Amino acid sequence: YEKLTKLMPNVRTFNSDAPRMPFMEGETYLGLAWNGEVIMAQDQGMPELDFVYPKEGAIMWMDNMVIPKNAKNNDNAHKFIDFILRPKYAAMISEEIGYGSPNEAAKKEMPPELANNPIVYPPADLLKHAMFREDVGDEIMALYQQYWDRLKVDM
């Protein structure tokens, strides 16, 4: 926490909903953003924005689709997931949102500039140093929240 407080004078904004916007609005030139947000910024007129994976490692993230066990229309939910995972449609979704697809066959349907983009599909040597955030439990999460709130107030 103490190290973070020393960095706070350099922090201009917190934006996790659309982290490309502070870059696009000229508010900041360095920051944390999801890779798909950088692709969106490039597509929206900021091709010079680049994405760098720290050599020490990066945080990995993935979105998932789930069907609650008591869901209505369970069959239709499965059909929808099957549909959007078809290579053609998975590629279309990736092209629209700038995030990669877990469907390897979809890459064959993508334009080469997307399928071969290391921002969208990081090389394996970078991923070996990346990690998923693990569940730290409610007690530690409450402590994180306490420090986070203090950092924002003291900003």
Report each predicted region and the residues it spans:
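Ligand-binding pocket segment of bilobal, Venus flytrap-like solute-binding proteins
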Residues: 1-54
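Sec/Tat-exported extracytoplasmic proteins
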Residues: 8-11, 27, 42-45, 69, ...
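Non-transmembrane alpha-helical segments in soluble domains
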Residues: 1, 5, 20, 24, ...
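Mature extracytoplasmic/periplasmic domains
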Residues: 68-128
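Conserved C-terminal helix/tail region of periplasmic/extracytoplasmic solute-binding proteins
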Residues: 124-155
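Short amphipathic alpha-helical segments
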Residues: 63-65
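Short, solvent-exposed loop/beta-turn-alpha elements that line the ligand-binding surface or hinge
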Residues: 1-6, 115-116, 132-134
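Short beta-strand->loop
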Residues: 47-59, 68-71
